[in-house]
Amino acid sequence: AVGKIKFDVSEMNIDFLSFTAHKLYGPKGIGALYINNNNPKAKLAKRLFGGSQEGSIKPGTLNVPAIVGFGKAIEICSQDMAKDFDLTISLRDKFYKNIVSNLNGVSINGSMKDRLPNNLNFFVDGVRADKLMLELRDLAFSNSSACSSGSTKPSRILKAIGLTDVQALSSVRFGFGR
């Protein structure tokens, strides 16, 4: 959601929020973690030990060029968010209408209204996602949900929203942007 929609971490009671620069057209390999310091239970245990960089959470030399690039990407996304929001919704909806008009058995996963503007996840009855990916090599898309892309098992996220194993294995995910 960072860089795609406006939200307020206080209003939404967010204690932890991780995000990465490449999702905002910034450099790969750099990310950020928001921790709500006002919540005494929102603590992060050390996983790596060494220097006191990054608030003593992670040792290592800071990648200053990537950090600066990340900051610039956030700045640009903040300025262009409304325009990008409208553009990505338009692209997503046109693409979906085209898919539905040319394929039978297409079902959206989740709601078309209550989703990120740049995301489209659906399945086609009777067509496994891995087979569809082989047939449509000219398109860049993923199977399943973002957190289980590339897995041969049904996505636990898609199953949690009520899909069967077959439907989850038939699901594909498209992302839209500038």
Which ranges hold each PLM region?
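Pyridoxal 5′-phosphate
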Residues: 1-178
